[in-house]
């Protein structure tokens, strides 16, 4: 493909998630690379520009992180506008962003996944520790990167992690610790 075959490309960045700053860094790096390739690319910060402004672009390079960028929302909007974009479709993005839903899909497909327990306001450290070896993790289901992920080995850490994770998402779960290198 030639640079002109992409048309005008909106590099979507920034947004409103708790990962805004890293999204801006990623977006500007992608914008520089596209411009170096002579692609007609433009920065588009979804926090400061209305999404209807996307109609003037032929395609979008998604550099939004977390909520509204990786959860299928922006993909659904781009689909409705008929704008092609990078990454997975809306449904795959939504499933990929939801850690708990992903684990259910893995189990249904017989794909091994660390043991986990859905938590609620009645959950307590002692009961979770009986089910999962100590230490374990508490995770907000819908959050990108490692935001909303807490390693827990005490009652105090458990209470703090549960409280903080609930600020991010209503669905929070505990997951066993698996030692190894993260890829």
What residues fall within each predicted segment?
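ATP-grasp fold ATP-binding core
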Residues: 106-107, 129-149, 169-180
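ATP-binding N-terminal substructure of ATP-dependent carboxylate-amine bond-forming enzymes
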Residues: 1-104, 108, 120-128
């Amino acid at each position: 493909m030639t640079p002109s075959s992409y048309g005008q490309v909106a590099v979507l960045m920034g947004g409103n998630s708790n990962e805004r700053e890293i999204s801006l860094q990623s977006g500007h790096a992608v914008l520089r690379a596209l411009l170096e390739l002579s692609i007609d690319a433009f920065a588009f910060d979804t926090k400061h520009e209305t999404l209807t402004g996307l109609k003037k672009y032929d395609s979008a390079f998604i550099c939004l992180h977390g909520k509204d960028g990786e959860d299928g929302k922006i993909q659904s909007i781009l689909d409705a506008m008929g704008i092609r974009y990078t990454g997975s479709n809306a449904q795959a993005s939504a499933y990929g962003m939801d850690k708990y839903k992903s684990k259910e899909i893995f189990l249904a497909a017989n794909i091994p996944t660390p043991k986990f327990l859905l938590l609620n306001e009645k959950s307590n450290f002692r009961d979770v520790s009986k089910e999962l070896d100590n230490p374990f993790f508490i995770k907000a289901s819908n959050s990108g990167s490692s935001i909303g992920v807490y390693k827990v080995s005490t009652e105090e850490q458990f209470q703090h992690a549960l409280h903080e994770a609930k600020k991010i998402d209503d669905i929070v779960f505990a997951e066993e610790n698996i030692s190894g290198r993260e890829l």
